[in-house]
Curated annotation (Swiss-Prot):
Tetramer of two alpha and two beta subunits. One of its GO terms (cellular component) is cytosol. Belongs to the class-II aminoacyl-tRNA synthetase family. It catalyses: tRNA(Gly) + glycine + ATP = glycyl-tRNA(Gly) + AMP + diphosphate. This is Glycine--tRNA ligase alpha subunit. Disulfide bonds: none annotated. InterPro entries: aa-tRNA-synth_II/BPL/LPL, Gly-tRNA-synth_heterodimer, Gly-tRNA_ligase_asu. SUPFAM superfamilies: Class II aaRS and biotin synthetases. It holds the Pfam family tRNA-synt_2e. It comes from Parasynechococcus marenigrum (strain WH8102). The keyword Nucleotide-binding applies. Its EC number is 6.1.1.14. It is found in: Cytoplasm.
Amino acid sequence: MHFQDIISTLQRFWADQGCLLLQPYDTEKGAGTMSPHTVLRAIGPEPWAVAYPEPCRRPTDGRYGDNPNRAQHYFQFQVLIKPSPDGIQETYLASLAALGIKAADHDIRFVEDNWESPTLGAWGVGWEVWLDGMEVTQFTYFQQCGGIDCKPVSIEITYGLERLATYLQDVESIWDLSWNAERNYGDIWLPFEKGQCHFNFEGSDPERLKQLFAIYEAEASDLIEKKLPAPALDFVLKCSHTFNLLEARGVISVTERTATIGRIRTLARRVAEAWLAEREALGFPLLEGGTLPSAA
């Protein structure tokens, strides 16, 4: 199954389960969780069901394209359902079957692994899903986002698309994965991977990155004060990515790392609080019986 067909198969499957199909969010982020379609929508009482592919960036994971299984840019497929439905593990196994992976023919294990994002002030309980000895999915019941208790609890399912694809295509290197019948993964992404790694590890200017972090932090704080949580989140995500770039350059001390994560977490908490207040002021319109505000 080609890489693009894995995405479309998961999209069809989760659409049939009642999920909205959305597109990737248009700023750098380290995980699909950081999209507002997850990190904001997991907060508050309104129901939500969404599925979307998400490109992710983790600068320190780059290896100039020389490692067959590690890259600073990769893809996840993200599912968030609130409240968490009954039988979600069985539904997930059915999604694997849709990809041609039948539970009866494979060793599929749910291994306890609680999840935490220090920068988002988010955590949950759940499992890693191992397929014949390889982790392919993270299952998380969100307990908090932005330091706010999640009521009701959401279920987040995050598929590692490259890992699934290497298994389904039986290849050793992600760069050899077929994207479709004509092009492979490396044809598309390897030039960007090499160039981005040079930037991440050698080409970026640490002092300029620190200046950018301060600008993004100030912008996020100002937007929160103006009660604009959605654009404020964009700048929190920019802070997070800029911090990751500074880590890749090796210019963040242990003390600075802890303090900087704390600054981002504080912003994330303030965004979450502002988002919840905004939705509450609207009367939580996605609740049954709620009404959407009329257009101005």
